[in-house]
Amino acid sequence: LWDATLHVYAGTAIYEFEPAQQSSAAAPLDLVRGILQELQQTKSLRELCDQTAYLVRRLIGFDRVMVYRFLEDGAGHVIAESCAEELDPLVNLRYPASDIPKQARELYKRNWIRLICDVQASPCPIDFSSASGGAPLDLSYSTLRSVSPVHIEYLRNMKVGASMSISIIVGGELWGLIACHHMKPNFVAANLRAAGELLGQVFSLQIQTVEGIEAYVTMRAARALLDRIVAEFPVDGDLIENLAQRLEPLSAFINSDGAGIWIDGIWRSTGLSIPMTEVA
């Protein structure tokens, strides 16, 4: 038996065939229904990402699953991870933007899921001359498309045998990736990949929901803090000293190590802050 996928791009129909696996009979929705219910019960972004890493690893059986978030400068930050006990954790590590260049990110926006079942395998050429009049066949949306040799070498250097990634797209932009690594070659069946893609789409929507809730809660808390400061602010006394006495709750609210205020050459601070000589 074979699993087959079909997509049409630029007027060309592309069929892809792969040997069917024993798990291929299960429908993707049946595989992830329970997982989706668990994700919808999470209350914070951290809990959502931690739970997603654990559940994806349980679904596909890889040695390591990471939630990898792109920062404003293009660098990547591993914000959640589930991995085998014998592996060194990578959570909280950051990687330069050059690890996943802009061109690669555009492909991640086109394809929700990407699988490299064996990093040691040799790519197979495609004879497209007769079908396309000699023009290169665009495999941007192909499931079995080969990947950059540079990326393959990168995975080999990490001692990775197989890799799978699920795109996280929030508001039309690539927010991050669910990156999955296995130390040995590992072929993920088509229905499991479809389940992973569905999970990635729901996860992306859930991120948007949770981030919206967290932003609203933060805004309400900021408003309440500001109202309290204004209500308690003395109508007389030294302005700078009165402001300085309220630096600590402001610093705690934004989770900073310290805060300071500089008015007319006078510096007041709380917690860990820079000396006045560096402010002047």
Regions found by a protein language model. Name each.
Residues 38, 42, 55, 59, ...:
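Signal-transmission/dimerization alpha-helices at domain junctions
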Residues 114-159:
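Active-site-adjacent "gating/activation" loops or surface patches in catalytic cores
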Residues 11, 68-129, 262-280:
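GAF sensory/regulatory domain recognition
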Residues 28-32, 100-101, 109-113, 121, ...:
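Alpha-helix initiation and N-capping motif
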Residues 40-66, 70-71, 209-274:
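Signal-transducing coiled-coil/dimerization helices and immediately adjacent hinge/linker segments
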Residues 12-45, 136-147, 202, 207, ...:
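PAS-family sensory modules
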Residues 1-27, 60-63, 76-77, 81, ...:
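Sensory/regulatory domains in signal-transduction proteins
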Residues 5-7, 56-59, 68-70, 85, ...:
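A general structural signal for short secondary-structure junctions and capping/turn motifs
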